[in-house]
Every structure is written in C-alpha cells, then in structure tokens.
Amino acid sequence: MKKVLFYTLLVIAGISTANAQEIFSKSLKNGIPVHITNNRDKAFAMKAGEAGYDAKSGMAAYTADEIWYLVGNADGFRMYNHALGKKHALKLVGNESGAAATMASEKEATLLTITAQEDGSYAISPKDAPGESFNMFGGAGKDIKLYSSGDKGGHWNFKTIDMSRTLEIEYNADLDGALETNYKIGEIAISIDGQKGAIIVDRNNIPKSTKCYLPKDAKVGISCKKAYHGWKMNVNGAEEIAELPLPEKGLQVAINITADKDNRYQYLYYSPDEKGIPYRIPAIATTANGYVFAINDYRPCGNDIGFGEVDLVMRHSTKAGEEWDGTSWTEPVKIADGLGKEATETWLTGFGDPAIVADRERNEILVMSVCGNRLCWHGNYGAGTEQNPENPNRMARLRIIYNEETGTWEATEPEEVTYDIYPLFKDKEGKAHVGSMFIGAGRIAQSSMIKVGDYYRIYCAVWAVETGSYRHHNYALYSDDFGKTWNLLGELGNDFNDSPAPLGNEPKCEELPDGSVLLSSRKGYGRYFNVFHYTNFERAEGYWDGAVATDQVGNLKFGSNDTNGEPLRIGNVLFQSVPTGNNRSGVSIFYKELSDDPATYTPTELSNGWKKIQITDRESAYSSMCILPDGNIGLYYEEEPGGYSMVYVPVEFDKTLDTMTYCCGLPFRCSICKKGLEMIFITIEDPIEE
C-alpha cells in the first residue's frame, strides 16, 4: 500500500518512479552518490558535520562532505556521507521539531523516508514521523534539524554525481600585507548548470587544493568577483571562467590570492560568526583621550529585541592620540549580556540598538540601549490590562570609564531606566502619548556650545509608537548630566501630529553651528529633517520648524530603501551617511557646506546643496560616524557578507570633497600627547563628480 501511495505522489510531482529510484542504493559498496540542495534557498546544500557533530547547511561547494548515499529505498533508507565513509550515518536525536541530525555510528542511524512535493522537491522525514522534515533550522546556513514538513524550507532537490569527473582547485596565496582583522578572503562562486554555489576561503585554513564532485553532464563556471575587502583573487589569471561543459577528464584551475595592500576597510565582526550568530546595529565614538570605540548587537536569538537573547559587544582601538593607527583593535568584549529565557526580570532578556556618546572632556562613554522581551511595535506603556499587563519596549543605561591607574576601560553593569524616560510622554491629565519607543541607534550628539553644570548637553531622538495605535513618529531628548536624567526637547503637543517628525522612523540628532538641533529621521528615498531653534539655551526653551521630506524639497535623495543613517557636523560641513540603492546597498556619505547665516538653518534649506561620496557598491545598511584622532571620519557600517558583517573604514575627505577649507573641531584635547589638538584646518583639493 505504501508503494502505491508513493508512486502516486511522484506522478503528481511530474517525476517518474524510475528517475526517483536512481537516487537510492542497495548497498554502500555500490552506492549512488547524491548531492542535496534546498529547494527554497537553492544555493545551499546539506553538509555532514564531523563524526559526532550535527549535520549542517552551507553554500553549495560540491565537496566530499556534501555527497550523500541513500541506502535503502523510498519506504526506508539510511544516509551516509562520502567524507565520513561507511562507519558513520545520519542519526536524529528525536522525532519532534527541533531535533538535531548528527553523524553517528552506523548502528545508530535513523530510518528515513522521502515524500514528493508538487513542485518536484522532496521532504526528508524520519519514517516514524512523516509530518517532520529536515530543515535549515533558523534559516539558510544553519544546522539541519526537524521542522514541519509543510514548511518550504524543509524541501530538497537531489542530483546524482559523476565521481569520475571532478573540478580540482589549487590555491596560490600571498598573504603578506593583509590587515589582521580581515581573515576571510572571499567567495569562489561555482555555477553548476546555472545553479549558484560557493567556496568561502579563509586565510587561516587555505587548503592546498579542493576537489568538487559534479553532476553528470554538468556545465561548470567559476568566478572570483566576490573577494572581500583586503584581498584580490583570480582564477587562471582572470576574474571568471564562463560556464562550459565539464571535460571528460575533469577540470583543473588555479585560484591566485594576494593581499590588497592599499585596502583600509576592516571587518571588526564577520556575520554570522562560527556559531551562526549574527551581528547588527553599529555605533562608533572617539573618546577624549583618543581611543575609538565600536559597539554593536550580538544576537544569539538571531533577531531583534523581543525574540530572545541579544547582547552588546565592543572593541576599541589599542592605540590612542598620536599613537593611534586605526588598524589594531582589542578582542571583542561583552558589555551587556542578555539572559534570554533565563532572565528572572523582563528587562534582562536582551540588550540591543546601542546609542553612544563619548564625553568631550572626560574619558567616559554613555551607552543607552533598548532592552527586555517586547517587540518594539507591541509595547503598551500606559495601556496595560489584566490580560495584557503593561510591558513597554524597555530601556537601559551603562557607562564605560577609563581607569587611569590600570590604563584600561571598564564597563558598568547595565541599569534599567525605562520608568525614568516614559513618564516624559504623559500629558497633564496623565495620558501616555507613547506606548513603545527606543533611542535611535548610533551616535548620541554632544553640544560644543551648551554646558549646564559639569557636562556639555547631549541629544538623542526616539522612535516612538503612539499609545493605542501602530503609528510611529519621533521626539528628541536632551540631558545636561550625561544621561543621568533626560528631558523632552520642545513641547509634547496634543497628539501624534505635533511630534517633530510625525512619520519618522529611526532618528538621530546633530548640533548646528548656532546651537540649534537637527533631527534627521529614516525614510525611503530621503530623510525627514526638522530643526529645533533655541529661545533660551539654559532652560532648553525653543520651537521646532516642522518636518520636511528632503527628497521632496531638496536634493538629499536616493533609492527607495528605508534605512537608519547618521548626520555628523565637522565645522561648517554637514555629513549624512545612508544607503543609496533601492534595496539596502551602496552606503554613501552625503555632504554639504553650511552657511554662517543661522537663517539658513531650516529643514528646507538644509535639504539642498548635497553632494555624495559612495563608500561601497555592495549590499549594506545601517551606519554610524565619528571624528577620528587625525580629524577624518570613521565610518562603522553594515555590509555583506552575511546580514550583516560589521565594517570600519576611515574616510579621508581632504582628497574627495569639493575645493573648500573647513574648520575641524576635534572632540578632545589629547591627554597622551598633551598637544591640545583642538583645531585643524584642511584644504580640500581634487573635487569629485556629484
């Protein structure tokens, strides 16, 4: 009966029983080699781990660990792997969703079945649990575990392999001159009958050669176009070999690798890491004594706050002041450790989206963070019920302080400040106007003019959801005690439409030359700009102009991507980083010269007169900027590979801006060299095309 049912399913799928049976072997000795790729993420293949380790998925490279033998028949078979031989086979540790597939001894192997799908792919299931299927659990590139066989991520395609005709790749590598941080070299793209796969090359384990086992009568192409920053690659002296039929005797090629000694891009974190955990959300700052700090999310849960554990990690330059070289960094340190499911208090579940500022006088960094277990859209401050108790998107604060005695930086434990900030958004009747919010991640701005008490004033802006609705908008906050207490900049207003940016997404602030404050908020095609003008600096009294869309009233415009970016002012030049593609790609820095007339500091005037410098043409997203110890800009941003790796690059604008002279006020007096580097005058040459 089972055989009749299986035959019917194969007919529906449009595949003959004879063809399907070609993937099965009666014994391992005369086994039919099979390559298995995911039907949804077709560039990813099923790979064996080492003996005793979980099977996994990865970009298809057609190497020995991707070649399988299905010994048995459609009613029941066991899976062996070419790299491990006949003593090991695939074993499931259970039959329920989430059960891992490991490479165990032959005696422990799990009996499996396949079920054909309407699109011609197959679900691979334990015989005792046909409702579950092998799945790239958590997404492409993750370990193989069981999940519902109805999920399309658990459907697979089979190709038989001709083991006699191989693609053999030899490697010639000259690694001298590479930056220490850039240990991944790039992807060697392999195209098999139009289907893409890749071998990722790492300088720490470059093999002498790689042997790839290909399908019968395959056409094969090879490309080295995707070298990562810091490296150059070619295949047989060219960028690529176009797809062609595999010769009878196979194909041998040479991959030549050299370090790009002119490269200045550095990967502070490749994403995902070796555990499959991604990084995201960059923030960068330069301290008073000239250290550069890079802080970002580390996401064991794989996603934003609200999905589980998220941590904050930091690296900083090992040198500062005159000794700063911009190329050497400390090892990563976790400064806020989310506890995920182990959290005994809600706010300790995770910490993410760092917003940071380094004080211009003290060797101290303030880090503000969203925290907790609530998705940003679902916070309900002021609207809790018995069925849905109040649980807003929570907020935390920590500091990183320089120990003068030890010469090291020490982070304080995070502390929750949720209920220090949310009450700012209640009106006189006690009604909450904001149900959920977080501070725009990246750089918190610090005034160079306004000092009330011991600290110069700092500014941040919040993404906020109106209580009782899903409408997001922005407000700005300021602090005169370096984040100990916060106040609303401007009036709360009566409703959503009275906010500084009624439709704004993730926002940032920057001070303009007269002390007024620019709000720059995320939107597709451009930014929302608004400006707060002071009538009294000390009491922080003043008014907002009204938000404008820069792409509608000016020339700060780009593709449809809707992505976090950052404004930064150096003297009389205003910068704005943001991706420029329709998708998240092409992170660039826009810039414009500011007039010395405060009457021009309006949202509409500030939307005009921009020019652009493209930093990357690759997939890229969020970004943050700081002024480096040498007066140039440090850009910390998200870029492929992964979604996303964290990339730092110094940008020397004296070689790229239009001809002008600008005054660069460094944010520190160097406590090491004691030279008081407070003002630098740079003459700009070599204008570029807009």
Annotate the PLM regions.
Residues 165-172, 223-225, 242-262:
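Conserved "repeat-terminator" motif of extracellular CCP/Sushi domains
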Residues 21-164:
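Lectin-like carbohydrate-binding module/patch detector with strong preference for beta-trefoil
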Residues 46, 175-201:
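Short, ordered, surface-exposed loop/turn motifs in non-cytosolic proteins
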Residues 1-21:
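Bacterial Sec-dependent N-terminal signal peptides
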Residues 262-669:
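Asp-box/BNR beta-propeller blade signature and adjacent active/binding-site loops
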Residues 167-177, 181, 190, 255, ...:
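A short, amphipathic beta-strand motif
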Residues 135, 215-241:
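Surface-exposed interfaces of beta-sheet-rich extracellular modules
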Residues 194-214, 237-248:
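Short, solvent-exposed S/T- and G/P-enriched segments that are highly enriched in secreted/extracellular
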